A protein has these predicted regions:
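Alpha/beta catalytic barrel-like cores
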Residues: 1-123, 136
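Conserved, mostly hydrophobic/aromatic
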Residues: 36, 130, 169
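Hydrophobic residues within beta-strands of alpha/beta enzymes
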Residues: 60, 128, 167-168
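Short, active-site-adjacent cap segments at secondary-structure transitions
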Residues: 68, 174-175
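Short glycine-centered, acidic/aromatic-flanked micro-motifs in structured strand/loop junctions
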Residues: 91, 132, 171
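Surface-exposed cleft-lining segments at the edges of enzyme active sites
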Residues: 103-104, 134-146, 175
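Structured alpha-helical segments in the cores of large, soluble enzyme domains
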Residues: 113-127, 149-165
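Amphipathic alpha-helical interface segments within eukaryotic helical scaffold
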Residues: 163-166, 171-174
Length: 175
């Protein structure tokens, strides 16, 4: 409960710094930067070491690469925690087409999630994020899509709670 309350502290927000390698590469390509672990870390270090960031940010969603990196020889989750910022982790593995649907999506990542959550908790994660994509359109979403995504989100949330990790459910609605 204290983690959930801290996440929604008045006047603060959650910073999504969970770009995948593919997404961060696209962003860096636009400005002529090469994406590699060192450059990605330098970018995130710039964000996390911003003076006074803790006055505006209650939590940061990290990517798997980032939760394992260090700033000044301190693991990033510990670095953020020392500033009073909750470290979180993106745990879904992206979307694929929902079989038998009209191009609707289902999110992957439940396989091995229990073990990954145990490791992320040991690394200092206090919350996790899982994205489900719901498409709105003519005859969409289908009941099948809603039910399949709800089932996956329920399993994700239950696994998080087993590890004392607060689950964030992110329904991404596409119109």
């Amino acid at each position: 409960k204290s983690t959930a309350n801290a996440m929604v502290a008045k006047g603060k927000g959650i910073l999504a710094a969970d770009e995948s390698a593919k997404t961060i590469q696209k962003r860096f390509d636009k400005i002529g930067l090469k994406s590699d672990p060192d450059t990605n870390l330098a970018y995130r270090k710039m964000l996390f070491t911003t003076p006074g960031i803790e006055n505006y940010i209650s939590g940061v969603i990290l990517f798997d690469e980032t939760i394992r990196q260090s700033i000044d020889n301190v693991l990033i989750p510990e670095y953020l925690s020392k500033k009073g910022i909750l470290p979180g982790i993106k745990v879904d593995k992206g979307t694929v087409d929902l079989p038998g649907s009209l191009g609707e999506k289902i999110t992957e990542g439940l396989d091995g999630l229990k073990e990954r959550l145990k490791e992320y908790a040991q690394l200092g994660a206090k919350f996790a994020k899982w994205r489900a994509v719901i498409t709105i359109g003519q005859n969409l979403p289908t009941d099948k899509s809603i039910e399949a995504n709800a089932e996956v989100l329920t399993k994700y949330a239950a696994l998080c709670q087993e590890q004392d990790i607060v689950p964030i459910v992110e329904p991404e609605v596409l119109m």
